[in-house]
Amino acid sequence: MDYFLIGIGGACGSIVRYKIGDIISKRTKSKFPWGTFIINITGAFLLGIITKSGAGKNLSMILADGFLGAYTTFSTFMYEGFNLFENKKKLNALIYILSSIIIGILGFYMGEFISQL
């Protein structure tokens, strides 16, 4: 049953990630990977909410492990950061990587804080 719940959440999370990433990339003309950045930050924020919300085991598996596991994308984050470095956009790469980490941590803490209100 655990794998089924995680699989359902994961399928939904990957579809939502693809759609949001597609919408963002069509609306921005920047070389900066805004889609992945926004997805990862909102994913960290939502994970903060879920971890402190007192969600039961099954709901947590669907949302945290499944949905957010597929929604956020560390491999794409690394790929885009590396490509910025490789394409001689070192400052953009540095800003992207550091801001993703710092704002991601802040987003997680904000999510935890909001869930306790």
UniProtKB/Swiss-Prot annotation:
Binding-site list for Na(+): G69, T72
Cell location: Cell membrane
Catalytic reaction list: fluoride(in) = fluoride(out)
Record comment: activity regulation: Na(+) is not transported, but it plays an essential structural role and its presence is essential for fluoride channel function.
Signal peptide stretch: none
One GO MF term: metal ion binding
Listed GO CC annotations: plasma membrane
Listed transmembrane segments: 4-24, 31-51, 59-79, 94-114
Record key words, sorted: Cell membrane, Ion channel, Ion transport, Membrane, Metal-binding, Sodium, Transmembrane, Transmembrane helix, Transport
GO biological process, one term: cellular detoxification of fluoride
Major site of localization recorded for this protein: membrane
Entry-linked InterPro entries: FluC
Topological category with respect to the lipid bilayer: Multi-pass membrane protein
Family the entry assigns: Belongs to the fluoride channel Fluc/FEX (TC 1.A.43) family.
NCBIfam families: crcB, PRK14232.1
Protein task: Fluoride-specific ion channel. Important for reducing fluoride concentration in the cell, thus reducing its toxicity.
Official protein name in the record: Fluoride-specific ion channel FluC 2
Source taxonomy: Bacteria, Bacillati, Bacillota, Clostridia, Eubacteriales
Gene that encodes it: fluC2
